[in-house]
Amino acid sequence: MGADVEQDDTEQYLKQGTLAVLGVLRELLQNQTPMRVSHPRGQFITRLLHVDKTNMVIDFGSNDYDNQLAQEANELHIVADTRGARIELILTSLQMSEYEGLPAFTAALPGQLKMIQRREFFRVDAPLNPIFFCYVPWPDGTGEGRLRLQDLSIGGIGMLSEGTVPDALSCGDTIKKLRLEMGEYGRFVVDAQLISIGKHSVVGSKCETVVTPRLSLRFLSLNAAQERELQQVIFSLERLARDKAKRFQ
């Protein structure tokens, strides 16, 4: 599944007016939630530094060229994912400024924003190269399994087994200290709950159908720092997928 959810799994709420918009943005500020700023010529990851009834201040991106392009853009789309909803808003421009002595962008507080609440979280597919692995201590104490990460969200993961899974494994089981090894994006150790056990089918090199177990889990214990880091990974993987798609157009 890509970086979207099915329409039936979403409820869209338009927040209008200063107080409603300010309330949502203050929560993003308090949680230091990463935000993706996109425009026709590029994108970058940032965070809110300050927000009040008239303006919002966001941090500079890490690349000077990206910052220059953002300053020249006439319309910028902002996306931030929380555990409860995806926040989307549009800014007409960014102005260079300073915040606490460091360069920043200032924009007028938007008159509205969209909150997309869902039963399912937005998921992004994990890359096939390099492969990311999940190391799963089986709840029945029979050892540790290595599974391939298939997709990732703030809410949980989908993973594919390279072999069989323990017969005693069942939905609702808690997996302690699940380890995600994601190469350059780092390692995450979290507790998770098994939501479903399914099957994943692909066509093999000899045109045969290969069926492997697929496990879906939801995270139980992400702290604020892990959530921010995981969101950065998701944004990076989304960008990687878009860049790859453009090359094959």
From Swiss-Prot:
UniProt GO BP: bacterial-type flagellum-dependent cell motility; regulation of bacterial-type flagellum-dependent cell motility by regulation of motor speed
UniProt entry keywords in alphabetical sequence: Bacterial flagellum, c-di-GMP, Nucleotide-binding
GO cellular component terms attached to this protein's record: bacterial-type flagellum basal body
Source domain of life: Bacteria
Keyword Nucleotide-binding: yes
Classification via Gene3D superfamilies: Electron Transport, Fmn-binding Protein, Chain A, predicted glycosyltransferase like domains
Family: Belongs to the YcgR family.
Name of the molecule in the record: Flagellar brake protein YcgR
Organism: Erwinia tasmaniensis (strain DSM 17950 / CFBP 7177 / CIP 109463 / NCPPB 4357 / Et1/99)
